[in-house]
């Protein structure tokens, strides 16, 4: 046995075999661990690709952000009141603290947004409506906008001004949903959804934004559907409810954790009676609240729009404000803070109360008209002014905060209008409730039972009605149910909200639609049922008939002419100008790429192109080159729609490969028509071989370059090297406006080609549909277009002739 061992140990082949066996065992062990690792990774990727993981992560993240904003904002307001109380007794220092504190915060918020991301200013819901509809708005869903919106909104809310959190936070949640989706796609290796297919993700983000803003999961889903979507996919229902419920739960748990609340309760605690919440005799008062809220809501939207339109007009004041962006928020902040100074004019309309304190005081169960000693009412005591009636105080609060809120939300800071309007509605409802308590001091008697009137109930109903009138949403009633924890007032609240919507929708668009109209965002207005003329309008009446198209027989000179004559982003692609049969649609950047690749400086020297490329490879790769002829930058092709050309370079690598040709050398701009005015030779888009190529360019005269380019421009284009959309959306001339509106809304279209038996006869875009709808709304009556009248008359004559021939045939 020992002999065999010694023989084996002395045998190099045996030793080599044992070494290989050991290495094989190590490799086997490594391969096992690698297989386990790959299995775990695949499982992780599969889990991260699930919808519920995405929803839970998004809900937890948004709840944390919302809680952090509320926590910092509440501490900021406490510090504000602490500073004001420290200098009590010195009126001058009190005024200085009261004005300077919000002034510093508002200016910081405005400046921060201007530097980081100007798209963070305002509400964000109008822009989201257009994005969900299919429009592309750049930089609205980026990380920079998220940072600017979050920081700016937190600082602005700490100022104690009538500014809301709901609209901006919906925008923040949508940004988080987009960024989180991109991150999970990167981790799991999935292809990210196209820009126009992210409506479901953005809708869920909107629902989560409302849910963790107020802790209202049900209302969050419903409100997001009403406000942001014209058509909602039922498949997103469970996503919205799951994410909303989880985010609202985490948001409330965090509040309990920091001991802001004792347990999971409603955001605004109320103690209304639950056995008999209201009497039928109170329904007329609730209806009055709804009708009045409708009028005041429409007036608020009108006033807000007039302020914005005035600031956009060109005059001496607006010129100064546009040059110095911080002057406008500084002036508005100074004026509002001065008027709200508690020892001054502000003492007459409860300006010392912060927004949340105001809502809590308006929702209390006490009847102020019956209160003799207000010192035991807490914050509600600030509504009692010596020698001043409580109704006058509430009326002053409503009037002053009405125009203050309409003015404050126009400042260039992240802000919304939901909470200020909510306060206004609560004051209006409280006013009616106190008036009812004054008219019926002993309560209402019905069937031998006595029902006492609680003005706090009227305040809740007024808050829901006013916000519904401004936003044109009925789900504000559900928001109030979840905010107050009171569901016993379903009937009166729904009556008030529906009446408010009926009145407001007949007078003004919603606040978000008003901003869309002012900013001229690509969005379709709603098609009213009351417009009978819409059924007579067809696509042939509103389409653009003079269409610039590109034919399959076009030359490079024709392409250059089309680009110089129009600024369209897409062109219809037809077979020949004579037949005009629609074959597809081609993007502007694709046409630019065809010209850049064809009329190139390297194509002028085909014999020396390879040598130039080889010499350029060995030369300095980092050297830049500019071979532009002086004075010709204006007519250079490189400057035709330069922003779109730069945007095309930022596309995905796959798309860039599709349009690449066999000669991937630096392109040159297209020259001008005259030999004495040539265009630039090179662009600063490629490096390395430019300096070598310039040597060969110096050997050509301007006349030779001009003749060569003229020959190239007469060559028929080969469209096989570019991407063509072979299935653009098409309509026929007889398509009704109603059906066209539905198709554009459902599919997120921005244009459609109109054909007749395959022949291109026109194009209709959002602008034409919007003009047709708005024309049918203005002044309540719209004359049908001339073509429609001619068509209807012709159809009537044809039908008459058909009837005559049928009768004679019989």
From Swiss-Prot:
Sequence positions that bind chloride: 123, 418, 512
Source lineage: Eukaryota, Metazoa, Chordata, Craniata, Vertebrata
Disordered: region residues: 604-631, 658-688
A Pfam family reported for this protein in Swiss-Prot or TrEMBL: Voltage_CLC
InterPro entries the record matches: CBS_dom, CBS_dom_sf, Cl-channel_core, Cl_channel-0, Cl_channel_volt-gated, ClC
Cytoplasmic side: 2-48, 507-810
Sequence motif: Selectivity filter part_3, positions: 416-420
Name of this protein: Chloride channel protein
Domain CBS: 543-601, 724-781
